[in-house]
């Protein structure tokens, strides 16, 4: 099993605070039933981080957030 680290995700989203928000919102989407963008049997938080590290999810998550 490959380990996912925050450093891998920071290559895609350099700001730690934006990274945290994007991962949180994506994980919430996964919990609500949205389909994962990659095959993963991990928990939603880890899946969200894997998606960010691989470039499948990014800052567009912050644009979807209702204000």
From Swiss-Prot:
SMART domains: RNA_pol_Rpb6. Its EC number is 2.7.7.6. Pfam families: RNA_pol_Rpb6 (PF01192). GO terms for cellular component: DNA-directed RNA polymerase complex. It is an enzyme of class 2 (transferase). Gene3D superfamilies: 3.90.940.10. Keywords: DNA-directed RNA polymerase, Nucleotidyltransferase, Transcription, Transferase. InterPro entries: DNA-dir_RNA_pol_omega (IPR003716), Pol_omega/Rpo6/RPB6 (IPR006110), RPB6/omega-like_sf (IPR036161). It catalyses: RNA(n) + a ribonucleoside 5'-triphosphate = RNA(n+1) + diphosphate. Belongs to the RNA polymerase subunit omega family. Promotes RNA polymerase assembly. Latches the N- and C-terminal regions of the beta' subunit thereby facilitating its interaction with the beta and alpha subunits. This is DNA-directed RNA polymerase subunit omega.
């Amino acid at each position: 099993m490959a380990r996912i680290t925050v450093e891998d995700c920071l290559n895609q989203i350099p700001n730690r605070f934006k990274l945290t928000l994007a991962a949180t919102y994506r994980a919430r989407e996964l919990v609500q039933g949205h389909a994962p963008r990659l095959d993963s049997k991990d928990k939603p938080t880890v899946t969200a981080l894997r998606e960010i590290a691989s470039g499948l999810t990014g800052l567009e998550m912050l644009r979807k957030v209702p204000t």
